[in-house]
């Protein structure tokens, strides 16, 4: 009788163990099934979250899994999140991609960029009547965006240097607003004499009448360069990388869904990109002493 009870007890424990393992494995599988997306915080958190909503829904449909948007506190956090595979897909600026590529030892892959990113530009703005060209910035105060921003810091700094202006020596003071919209606000409020930012954010503010162009105006637009992209870690299976790439390339303004996503992403369409496209940005960063 005791042997029978012992056998039953052993079988019951085995069943409970298997059940517990099954629950645990299911929990892990569910966690792994969540596809995580992040983006550099180049605009306000509420604006970034708003822009992400229809794209997240679209990716859920394409991938067949739950997709979550994961906000980050700064540009460096977005780099670390992808390099450490805490997220699956990241929206980077060109410089942020270069930083992630170096930080990961070449283990990140840019998939697509907006057509606009093949010929992106930065813009310098001011509310001062005394500033009409770059040389007029000498002795003035200037706001960049984030230190890791391509269009809000690296490339504006690079073009200033090319014009014979060293921001650290020739300007009265430089500031970092943290985001493009914050740069506009700093110029409009008179906190700084001028600001450098992403041209698409400036154009959106002008179109939406969020800035008084009778007071704040653009006075210099940079030459073009490659900028933003959607990037993944090389550990992502090739089949999933292709699925993501095809999903972005398939977005069209001819469908309601595509039109909404593209409008929020400020894109006419997405095109394939590659690491080699960002060599000039890497060189500019090295020349400006911004690569660590």
Q: How would you name each of these model-derived features?
A:
Residues 110-133, 230-233:
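Hydrophobic/proline-rich hinge and linker segments of small-molecule sensing/allosteric domains
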Residues 130, 140-239:
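Pocket-lining segment of extracytoplasmic ligand-binding domains
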Residues 32-39, 43-54, 227, 231-292:
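An extracytoplasmic/periplasmic, membrane-proximal ligand-sensing/linker region
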Residues 76-90, 103-104, 135-138, 179-200:
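Short helices/loops that flank or line small-molecule/ion binding pockets
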Residues 13, 21-30:
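C-terminal segment of classical bacterial N-terminal signal peptides
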Residues 1-9:
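N-terminal secretory signal peptides that target proteins for export/translocation
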Residues 42-45, 116, 126-131, 145-152:
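Short coil/turn segments
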